[in-house]
Structure formats: C-alpha cells, structure tokens
Amino acid sequence: MALHVLDEANRCLGCKKPMCQQGCPIHTNIPEVIRLLKDNHLDDAGRMLFENNPLTTVCSLVCNHENQCEGHCIRNRMPSHDPVHFSIIEDYISTTYANKMTSGPAPRNGMKAAVVGSGPAGLTVAVLLARWGYDVTIFDARDKIGGVMRYGIPNYRLPDSVLDDFQYRHLELKGIHVRPNTAIGKTITIDDLFRDGYKSVFIGAGLWKANAMHIKGETLGNAAFGIDYLANSKAFQLGDDIAVIGVGNSAMDCARTAIRNGARHVTCYARRDESCISASAYEVSYAKLEGVGFRFCKAPVEIRENGLICRDTVKGEDGKFTQVEGSETFYPHTGVIVSVSQGSENSLVKTTTGIETNQRGLLTVNEDGSTTREGVFAGGDAVMGARTVVEAVAIAKKVAESMDAYMKALPADNTPDPYADIPVFSTPTSDVLAKQGI
C-alpha cells in the first residue's frame, strides 16, 4: 500500500499554480502535503490535513474527487489523461496519522457552546471551537454521531469504524460532550440552551424529512423512501426486484445497497433523459458495473404492490419534459424506493422565537452564518440544502470563526452563583441503607 501511494505521489508535478488546490472546496494544500510525504514527513503531512479539515479521513473516501482535486489536476490535459489520485494519498496519510492523535483537550476559556446535529458541519464546528478552548456539547437526535455520514452513506463507501474512530480521537479525547437521542426542539429547546449558560448555538441538523412524490401507492408496504432505506436498509423487506425512483447520488447509494442486500434486479427510473443524471459519473459507472439498470424518460404515476406504473415523457423545444398521455406502462417489481430529495424538519424552528426560514424551510442566515436569532448560527444542509461533506466542512469552518468572534465580544458574565455557599451532602449515598446500618 505504501509503495503504491508513493508511486502515486511521485506522479505529482508540483505545479506553481496548483489547479488541484483550487478545485478543492476547502483549498487543501495538496502539493505541500505530497511534498511532505515524499520527504518522509508523514506526521507533518497528516497534521496539515487535519488542521485544515477535521474530517479528512471521511473526505478521502466520499469526496467527489473526479470534479474537485483530481478533476482539476493538470495531468488531465496530457494525452494520457491520468490525474494524480490524491484520494488514495489522503486516505493513507490521514488514517495512518490518526492513530497517533492522542492529545487531550485544549485549555478551557470558560465559555460553553452548543452544537445541534453531528453531521459534517456540526462535527467541524465542534472540533474547531474545542480547539480554541470552548466547552462544547453536541446534541443529536440519533444514538450515534455522524448524521448523514453514518445514516445516509452506505457502509461500503464509508465504514462506521471511521466515524467511531473520529468520535474517540476528536470528541472524547478532546473533552467534547455528546448527548445522543436528544432532538432539540422537542423536550429541550434553543431557549433552554441559553438558559443553561451556552453562549452560542450552532444548528447543523441535516435534511431528514423525505420529500414525497405524492403519487398513489407511496404508503404501501413494499415502498420506502430513500433516506429511510439508507438509515437501516436491512429493516426493509422489498424483495429481489427493486425499482429506484431517482438518479442522484442517494439513488445510486440505494440501488447499490439493494444489490448488496441480495436483490437480483435493480432498476433506476428517471423522468428525464440520461443527460440529466445528477449523480457523479463514478457512482453511475459503479452502479452499472454491479448490474443496476436504468430507464429514462419515465415518469412514475402510481406504485402498486407488484410494480410501478410509469408514463413516457418527451423533451420539448424549451428543454422541459412533459408526460405523454396514454403512454402508461406497468413495470413489474417486488419493491419500490423513492429517492428524489429530502427536506428539513421544522420542530426546532417551531419552538424557537426569532429564527426565520425561506420558502424551502431552510434557515435564513447572513454571510457570517448568523441566523435572525442573536447567538444562533447555522450551516450545512440546514441552510444550503443537500451538499457534499467537504462543502459542509468549508461552510462550517467560516461559521466557527464567526461564532468565536461573537463569543469573544460578549461582555463578561459576572452573575453570582446563588448556590455557591450551600452545604455539600456528605452522608451515605442512600438514606435507606444508612437507616438499616448498611
């Protein structure tokens, strides 16, 4: 593995104006990382990666490299069209160096910050604020950290072990608290957080509400929404011939997961033609390689217990696709997965005064990530809609800096503790046991 990585690193031309770095949403200094590796300074290279991107072990596996660093590599312009595969290099350096990350928390500055959601944006903000001395608590509605990375990306692409290791090295060792199974906006509200001394709150909750197509049959037992299927695919009994409605990255994840779960036939349906596929070319090519089929210009109109009814669509001169009346066809399937898009949950907004949203239900923020409620910041999918992990990290880094500046500018809190001088209970832990002489 190491020799292969070095072979790949040696192909880097060390450009003075590195296009690869420009193509990276968080501007990773790729030439310098590669130079350090080639000079046998792996630890320095790893440190540089993690300082720039706390989720570098994740991004090395799930980033859309073909359109970012590798897609911008100058070697693409050569006749051989063979870019340096930095994803391989980043994965090797980050996973190797991560095992050496055992340092404890930074000195505390006396201020607390709350992070709602443990997806890529929330984890990035939490790690950075803790690095700068804040006492950070993460609140997440699920039992394990990771958000969409754990519950929306299949394990074959991003193993749970990567996120488990992240929790140990970047959260537990750094003193970051995690409250699982705690959905802010229900029992606990944003107002409660400020009451309990948090000086600032970051909202990084993801898009967990599946958007329905509102066609007949979506409630049937052989149907599922993509976001629910990916969260726990083994829980669904959809048979061995599955239709997937959608051709985005999540749809590819659903299709490839179904194959791994034993489906013999999986077919993706798209309302438009092949040029409108929104999934990455890599994901589509892997899906086809694994046996996933595609049907284009098919608009689903009804889900049935034994299949899917679609209507043909045609592309007009204006570029829009319209359905052809009378062209309905029944396609037999044992199960149907609807994977078209996701929306945001609004329980948090409903229970918090002063936070505004747009027509899509996404949070309204200023350039610095601040919401319309003082002290509350937001980023990631909750603001921009569905984005990639690295895009969420890039946004979160800027918001973390804004939160840091905001909290540093707050007046000192000199409110005395009304219970500072009360006596400390020092008798046996149980009065009952004490009375029994135990």
Named regions from a protein language model:
Residues 14-39, 58-93, 137, 144, ...:
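Iron-sulfur cluster-binding cysteine motifs and their immediate structural context
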Residues 135-138, 142-172, 178-179, 255-300, ...:
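Rossmann-like dinucleotide-binding cores of NAD(P)H-dependent redox enzymes
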Residues 1-9, 29-58, 79-106, 438:
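Ferredoxin-type iron-sulfur electron-transfer modules in oxidoreductases and energy-metabolism complexes
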Residues 254, 382-407:
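A conserved FAD-binding loop/helix module that cradles the flavin
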Residues 92-107, 169-174, 178-186, 205, ...:
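Glycine-rich dinucleotide-binding loop and its adjacent helix/turn
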Residues 111-137, 250-259:
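N-terminal Rossmann-like FAD-binding beta1-loop-alpha1 element of flavoenzymes
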Residues 219-239, 321-386:
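FAD-site-proximal beta/loop scaffold in flavoenzymes
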Residues 44, 107, 112-116, 164-215, ...:
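Feature captures the FAD/FMN-dependent oxidoreductase FAD-binding
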